[in-house]
Amino acid sequence: MKTTILILLILGLGINAKSLEERKSEEEKLFKLLGKIIHHVGNFVHGFSHVFGDDQQDNGKFYGYYAEDNGKHWYDTGDQ
């Protein structure tokens, strides 16, 4: 009787451990997916702010010029 209970207990723990491992892999997949979504949303918001001029300082770097600097460029245009 004790042996039967012990065997059933061990089998039950094995099933729970397998279930736990399956849940861990599903959670890891979910966290990776959420990380990718957050990353892409951040990229979208950053690009959106450049296009619509929320930060003029960054726009100057993005487009390669500042109007108030009389055409000074952040990169070599070859005509200087």
Curated annotation (Swiss-Prot):
Residues 20-29, 54-80 form a propeptide. It is found in: Secreted. The modification Phenylalanine amide is found at F52. Keywords: Amidation, Antibiotic, Antimicrobial, Secreted, Signal. Residues 1-19 form the signal peptide. The keyword Secreted applies. InterPro entries: Clavanin. GO terms for biological process: defense response to bacterium. GO terms for cellular component: extracellular region. The keyword Nucleotidyltransferase does not apply. Has antimicrobial activity. This is Clavanin-E. It comes from Styela clava (Sea squirt).
